[in-house]
Amino acid sequence: MAVTMADITKLRKMTGAGMMDCKNALTEAEGDYDKAMEIIRKKGQAVAAKRSERDASEGCVLAKTTGDYAVVIALKCETDFVAQNADFVKLTQDILDLAVANKCKTLDEVKALPMGNGTVQDAVVDRSGITGEKMELDGYMTVEGTSTAVYNHMNRNGLCTIVAFNKNVDDQLAKQVAMQIAAMNPIAIDEDGVSEEVKEKEIAVAIEKTKAEQVQKAVEAALKKANINPAHVDSEEHMESNMAKGWITAEDIAKAKEIIATVSAEKAAHLPEQMIQNIAKGRLGKFLKEVCLLNQEDIMDAKKTVREVLAAADPELKVLDFKRFTLKAE
């Protein structure tokens, strides 16, 4: 039988496979959709196996709560077209539902769950075979508490958060906290949740940055005193181009280089240690305010912190845990 464009389009919507793959499969299957899907699946599995090293950076991220338990999971693929396919999204939702129902602790447990005639992992391989794209499960995380909330950013299935509380929470407030986590990407609930390794790294970076700034200030002051514009001599490239423009002379450049070398060494050798430490600690404090959920400015009211918003709702209300997963690099 003749294969029409309508037939090809229908199969493409059903499978997410390419137009030519759909046409060839329908031709081979003589118009039988079930047979065509099986042909695409087998061909796709072979193609997908060859794509195992490819980057699956698109996909579908979903989250679900049962009240005291919440889960987030991602099914990843190669293209946005496949990620938005209804069957692909449904498969992600079905896997999520199974994971929640079984309260799986790990991704391996999820993959081993019975699904259809095989396991969840088998179902993912089958879908990979249909589309010919690499697919993999990722981002499986859970939280538990007296109450939990989830947030799917703009309902686009690309970024989801889950959060657990020690008490029952107003739905709007719970969603607001989940949105806060999505928008501001905290790494911990409060300072106690930030590892000493991270704090030590940040303070070390802050110290070096502060020292460099103090040296730079001294150099710029010395250059200005010598009637040399610091912006004209801040790099070898600028020195050459500015001399070509007639803004500075070769003598200015020689003098500037001498000042930069001498003042830099002198200032670096006599930096006030206590001042450096104080500035660095201030920068660490700013860092902790930015990365700790409770310290962050509330996205709905920048005059308050998340801690203050929660305390206003209930002084005993606490965030127990949260998780965040996104497909996009940040």
Curated annotation (Swiss-Prot):
Single GO MF annotation: translation elongation factor activity
Keyword match Protein biosynthesis: yes
InterPro entries in UniProt: EF-Ts_dimer_sf (IPR036402), Transl_elong_EFTs/EF1B (IPR001816), Transl_elong_EFTs/EF1B_dimer (IPR014039), Transl_elong_Ts_CS (IPR018101), UBA-like_sf (IPR009060)
GO cellular component: cytoplasm
Keywords: Cytoplasm, Elongation factor, Protein biosynthesis
The keyword Protein biosynthesis appears for this protein: yes
Disulfide bond entries: none
Region (Involved in Mg(2+) ion dislocation from EF-Tu): 79-82
GO biological process, one term: translational elongation
Function per UniProt: Associates with the EF-Tu.GDP complex and induces the exchange of GDP to GTP. It remains bound to the aminoacyl-tRNA.EF-Tu.GTP complex up to the GTP hydrolysis stage on the ribosome.
Family: Belongs to the EF-Ts family.
PANTHER family named in the record: ELONGATION FACTOR TS, ELONGATION FACTOR TS, MITOCHONDRIAL
Protein name, per record: Elongation factor Ts
Gene (UniProt): tsf
